[in-house]
Amino acid sequence: MLVVLLILHAVSCAHSHGSPGAAVPVKQCPSACQCEEDGILLLVDCSEQGLSSVPTDLSPLTSYLDLSMNNISEIQPNAFRNLHFLSELRLSGNHLRHIPGPMLQGLYNLKVLMLQNNQLERLPSEDPWELPNLLSLRLDANLIMEVPARTLSGMRSLRHLWLDDNALTEIPVSALNDLSSLQAMTLALNRITLIPDYAFRNLSNLVVLHLHNNMIRTLGQNCFEGLHSLETLELNFNDLQEFPVAIRTLAKLQELGFHNNNIKAIPERAFVGNPLLQTIHFYENPIQFVGRSAFQFLPKLHTLSLNGATEIREFPDLKGTTSLQVLTLTRAGLTSLPYDLCHLLPKLKVLELSHNVIEELPSFYHCTSLQEIGLQHNLIKQIEMNTFQQLGSLRSLDLSWNSINSIHPDAFFSLQSLIKLDLTGNRLSNLPMTGLTSLTHLKLKGNMALSRSFGLEDFPNIRVIEMPYAYQCCVFGGCSSYRSASQWEEQMGSEEEDFQKKSPSLFPIHTDNNYDLDLEEFQLAIEESKLQTSIQCTPIPGPFKPCDNLFDSWVVRLGMWLISLVSLMGNSLLILTVFTSPSYLSPVKFIIGTISGANLLTGLCTGTLALVDARTFGEFALHGAQWEMGAGCRAVGFLSVLASEGSILFLTLAAVQCSVSVSCARAYGKSPSLGSVRAAAVACLALSLAVAALPLIGVGEYGATPLCMPSPLPDGEPSTLGFMVALIMMNSLCFLVITGTYIKLYWDLMKGDFDSIWDCAMIKHVAWLIFTNCLLYCPVAFLTFSSLLSLFPVSEEVVKSVVLVLLPLPASINPLLYLLFNPHFREDMRLLLSRAHLNHDRNLDSFVSVDTEKSSYDSTQALVSFATEADGVFESLSVPNPETVARFTCPPSVALIPCQMQMKPSTDRENTGENLIRSAPGLIAKEQEHIRSSGVDTQNGTSIFSGAYHSTGPSAHSQVFT
């Protein structure tokens, strides 16, 4: 009751001293604010109202006033004169540049003053703020460059001072001398370069001091003198060149952070004056030397972090530091661990030794409290039976990115609490299953030799699993219930973020003082119950990683068999007739044969895939990994690319050869020789071999999919993506060259200014090849290119079907075009059958007499004489050479097909040559009949005739037939 009377008396006095017109009701709330009563006092919230000045109608009973996030740039001198009960004033987030001392007069009960996030450049020096009961002052995030000596002299009760994120260049030593009650201060995020001696000599009650994110290079030897109560010191993110030996005077120091500096050495007995140290964060320093006694005899130390000390080769001596619970020594140069590690650190819970060069592990038998071990990115090759024995509390074990090729069958036998195991990126071919039944998280990605199948019975509690192959996820429901890629990536992204935070990371680096593994696991369990309702297994099976069958549908399956059979039979027959026929092998005909050879390889690869599909029908997941990683898949991929590129390059050569032949015949009267065409074909073959060999040396990958071709999907390796794009661009360029070349060829033929007679069968055949191959390649190139670059959504099913059917389809169509529509095939077959029949007759009539042989000799001589005479006649005429005539007039069924629509007027000599050509078949036929009737060896006769034919050279071919 007495307190209430005193308050009312004070209020009445305040009104009596004011002008009558300015009287304010006791509990009136400003119109732009929200008020709440706190007993007889008033809490006023005027934040974020766009105010440009302090409201004038504030109640004198206001105890809390929030004016933050407004547009106030200046405060009137008497704005708070009557607010004697004000205990908290918030002016943050305004545009204040200066606050004079008189503005805060009379606020004797003010305990909290917030002025952060303004534009304060200077503090009052002549008229200091008289705030005797102020406990907390926030001046952070301003533009303060200096704190005058008398500014803080009226705040003798101040306990918390924020001066971070300003423009200070030195410690305000004089201003701090009057703050003997100060308990916490931050000077972080300034431009301080030096801490002088005795900078904090009167701050005997200071417990927390933050000096991080400055430019401090030098510390005075006695700079921390007087800080008898200091427990937390932050010197992180500075430019310290030497270890801060001045910390030895801080007898009560418990938490020390000076990571991200430029300190190169930790001296012997570095922390001898800090026996109560509990946490040391010293990572991201270029440490080259650590004294053996540096971390000895720190019985309270429970967290030690030395990340990034790349020059450390030996494990630090931790004798007497028996309370250590979290030890982090990552990105150092450790080559081994002491065998008595667990005797030295019996309470160790978290051991993080990633990114070192450790090759062998000691036994962790006596580290019974260990809950997390991180040994990723080392050189460990094998895990012995006793390495992790009796670690009943171990929950997380990270052995990823080592060279582990062997794990003892009982290595995990006693790990009953193990729930997370990471073996990513090793060389395992087998995984022991004993002791892994409690796992909820398992990572085996990157162990490409580990192709065995796993079952649900192997991991009954599994929730998240990463396998080397997508086929191994089929048993975990990957085919039926896998989520979309975006949803999976979202969760994986959240897991990566959580790696840096407190919740479900696989192997976090702990920096907090009060680390609680049980709390983390509890949080992890809650998150998993929310996010996961089924087993999440990656990589996710799909059309290019099928679970049941290599081919998704019977249409594709039957189509592949049909393409394979037609290609194998058709191309074999074509090659047989082209290269074994006794008829003249023209350059274009030779190229047609090489194209058929490439198509035969394509048919062989297609048939191999069809056989694999038949062999693994209904259970491809059991064999998919072995097929992908096997030599057979790589061979199929190599031959597929070789055949595909060879076919396109040979087709390009055929188009160019036809065009060049026409041009050369018009200009020089002859076409390129068969030898030059063969050399060009060898060059095309060499280029195809080089392209097909690139994935074998790491540019692309043949085993990325069970189709054994470089993956046409955008989620492949960058090298594979680049290889596929380059392949499509090169093939598209070839088809452009082919199209342009043949347009020019037809333009030249339409002019009709050639003296020679051309056989258009081959020219038309090459044109049909160009049309069909280009027509079939366009959708393949378009869909593959769109899929690789994600130009628009293309389902994997469509891409797979197109690649399987349309890509090898030309290999079956090309030979059919030749076998069904090209007259040269029929003639070559007739010659082959005739020769076979004659060979059979020769075997029956092998008892020829000497007289018969003589008559045969005479006939042969007559035939040679005829050929010689024909040579003389044709050399004097502008008509085709006689041997070419003989070759193509022997079969009377082959017709001369002129390409040009009109010919030049024939001369008498041309008519004479034409008559001779027309009479040649009769002469040769009569001679052959004479030979046959005389019982002469027809094969020898053919050979002699061929010799006579070749005596004049193949150049005549360019003037008559292709």
Curated annotation (Swiss-Prot):
CDD domains: 7tmA_LGR6
InterPro entries tied to this protein: GPCR_Rhodpsn, GPCR_Rhodpsn_7TM, Gphrmn_rcpt_fam, Leu-rich_rpt, Leu-rich_rpt_typical-subtyp, LRR_dom_sf, LRRNT
Disulfide bonds: C633-C708
GO cellular component: plasma membrane
LRRNT domain residues: 20-60
Signal peptide: 1-16
Start and stop residues of the LRR repeats: 38-58, 59-82, 83-106, 107-131, 133-154, 155-178, 179-202, 203-226, 228-250, 251-273, 275-297, 298-321, 322-344, 345-368, 370-390, 391-414, 416-438
GO molecular function per UniProt: G protein-coupled peptide receptor activity; protein-hormone receptor activity
One Pfam family hit: LRR_1
Cellular compartment(s): Cell membrane
TM spans (from-to): 559-579, 590-610, 647-669, 679-699, 723-743, 766-786, 801-821
Record membrane topology: Multi-pass membrane protein
Key words of the record: Cell membrane, Disulfide bond, G-protein coupled receptor, Glycoprotein, Leucine-rich repeat, Membrane, Phosphoprotein, Receptor, Repeat, Signal, Transducer, Transmembrane, Transmembrane helix
Assigned protein family: Belongs to the G-protein coupled receptor 1 family.
Entry protein name: Leucine-rich repeat-containing G-protein coupled receptor 6
Organism per entry: Danio rerio (Zebrafish)
